[in-house]
Structures are given as structure tokens and as C-alpha cells.
Amino acid sequence: MAAPCLLRQGRAGALKTMLQEAQVFRGLASTVSLSAESGKSEKGQPHNPKKQSPPKKPAPVPAEPFDNTTYKNLQHHDYTTYTFLDLNLELSKFRMPQPSSGRESPRH
């Protein structure tokens, strides 16, 4: 069914048709640039636009309106530089001392 159509279009047209019809390569078809864009095939015959219809694009989904006044994570707004300072002070008495090699640490 598609073989005679592919043979008439030449190599570039065949690739273009394969990319447009293949389900896996549907996203790549628009990015591939082909030399058969001029309207004529490799043999010099005029290109018949009725045989290939351009793929129909689905209607764009309307974007959800952006509203940052209804932020759900209310705890996030309470964070400051000193938020966990009291927790660190409470837990510091439970920390184990770290072993040292006996020499000073390098100054970075």
C-alpha cells in the first residue's frame, strides 16, 4: 500500500513519510530537515500535495491560571536563618565528640 507511494517520492520523501506515519517517531518528524521541501521530487516531477495531508495538531490545552495567593504549604513561610537554631541547641548535648588526628585542620 505505501510502497509505490514511497518509491515515487524518492529517498527524502520516503524518509519524511516514514517519520510522519511512525507512532514512535511522531515527535521527531517536525525536527528533521529534508531536501524535498522545494515542491519537486528527485526526478523533477511536481509534488502532489493531495497524497500527504499534514498531521493535524490537537487543540492546545488552555493553561491553568497562575495564582500564588493560595499557597498550600504554610509552614514554608516560617523558615528563617534561625529557624532550627533552637533544635540544634537542644540536640547538641546528645552529640558524640568527633575523633581527631591530632593535627590542626587545614584553613580553606
Swiss-Prot record:
Residues 33-72 are annotated as: Disordered. It holds the Pfam family NDUFV3. Keywords: Electron transport, Membrane, Mitochondrion, Mitochondrion inner membrane, Phosphoprotein, Respiratory chain, Transit peptide, Transport. GO terms for cellular component: mitochondrial inner membrane; respiratory chain complex I. It is a peripheral membrane protein. It is found in: Mitochondrion inner membrane. The modification Phosphoserine is found at residue 105. The keyword Transit peptide applies. One of its GO terms (biological process) is mitochondrial ATP synthesis coupled electron transport. Accessory subunit of the mitochondrial membrane respiratory chain NADH dehydrogenase (Complex I), that is believed not to be involved in catalysis. Complex I functions in the transfer of electrons from NADH to the respiratory chain. The immediate electron acceptor for the enzyme is believed to be ubiquinone. May be the terminally assembled subunit of Complex I. Belongs to the complex I NDUFV3 subunit family. Complex I is composed of 45 different subunits. This is a component of the flavoprotein-sulfur (FP) fragment of the enzyme. This is NADH dehydrogenase [ubiquinone] flavoprotein 3, mitochondrial. It comes from Pongo pygmaeus. The lineage of its organism: Eukaryota, Metazoa, Chordata, Craniata, Vertebrata.
